[in-house]
Amino acid sequence: MRNLIFTLLFLTVFTSIFAQEVQVIQWFNLISDEVKFDDPFEKLTEGQIYDLSYIAKMRMLQERKPGSVGAESLKTIKEKEKKLTAEGVDIEGLLAQRAAITELRTKRAEAVVDSLNGLYVRMIGYLLPLDFEGKNGVEFLLVPWVGACIHTPPPPQNQIVYIKFDKGYETSSLFAPVWVEGILRTKSLTKELFLVDGISEINVGYAMSPSLIEGY
């Protein structure tokens, strides 16, 4: 009886410890908070961003090739400048920050969370197959939304996990919704995604060889 009690106690403690080691994470957990900055463009509406982009494009054309922008386009520029100014948009200030903000956005998209490296995690996502053995996929990209990398541009690389699953996971469609469970690695990779119209190179910030893939 004493041995039975000891065995049950051991199994209970072991199961509890193992359960605590599995960390359920969300996609936002993969985004590093080390690259912080105030992005003034995030405060603009879609219409304001469009108008600002139009102004920047026309100015660039005029600068590269004087006289290439017609009278009608110049009139449109003036109208958009007047409209944005009335809305409180600092046109010159924003255009001057474009290069710096673009660089910071790139750094933020590439930055991974180093503290996640080596942790046993469980997360949800959509499988985009890269390679098959028979009917089973053995390499995938785990992405946060349906259509990523094919119907929409690729997510930032810290929002893509490269999955290598030697056991193979049978899937009859793209973007199968799944739970994956395994040791997460911070690893910068570039994977080739074969599309109907060519090959797309996808930058990835994380990798995993899961112990488990299951549909949901």
Where are these regions (language model features)?
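Sec-dependent N-terminal signal peptides
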Residues: 4-13
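Contiguous, function-dense segments enriched for cysteine-driven chemistry
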Residues: 16
